[in-house]
């Protein structure tokens, strides 16, 4: 509900669908929101920074609900993937790092069908603050909306 309200407020204020910039589990929250609201047409693009799209090795030590959801091959992640329509990943640009100390191995931070951007030598939290990623995210504001299947637009 919070994501839906925020997207609605930005759209009302600007007249445009927003670019969502999501760090870590925020990218999973965006995917869950897109699933729950069938909201593909309501966003311009979704940029994920170090999101554990396929889980993360470190989550095996978590005992919280969110931590269990981020375990590699968790039932929650499998259900999320299974319930996403074909072509949704085209909305996504996924930044990932070979030095992410939270989301690893690096391959878990990519979403099949999305655009992928490798950032070398950057740890998990730096992905949000590093000038390279910030500037690249700003450039995405000008990128054309990807063509999606008519069913999801």
Regions found by a protein language model. Name each.
Residues 1-88, 95, 102:
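Serine-dependent carboxylesterase/thioesterase catalytic core
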Residues 87-153:
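C-terminal catalytic-base region of ester-bond hydrolases, centering on the histidine
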């Amino acid at each position: 509900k919070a994501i839906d309200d925020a997207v609605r407020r930005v759209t009302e204020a600007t007249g445009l669908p927003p670019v969502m910039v999501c760090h870590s589990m925020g990218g999973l929250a965006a995917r869950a929101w897109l699933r729950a609201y069938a909201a593909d047409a309501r966003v311009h693009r979704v940029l994920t920074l170090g999101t554990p799209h396929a889980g993360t090795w470190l989550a095996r030590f978590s005992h919280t609900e969110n931590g269990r959801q981020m375990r590699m091959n968790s039932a929650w992640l499998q259900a999320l993937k299974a319930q996403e329509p074909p072509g949704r990943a085209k909305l996504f640009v996924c930044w990932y790092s070979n030095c992410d100390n939270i989301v690893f191995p690096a391959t878990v931070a990519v979403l099949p069908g999305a655009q992928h951007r490798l950032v070398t030598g950057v740890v998990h939290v730096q992905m949000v603050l590093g000038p390279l990623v910030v500037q690249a995210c700003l450039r995405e504001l000008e990128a054309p909306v990807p063509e999606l299947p008519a069913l999801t637009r």
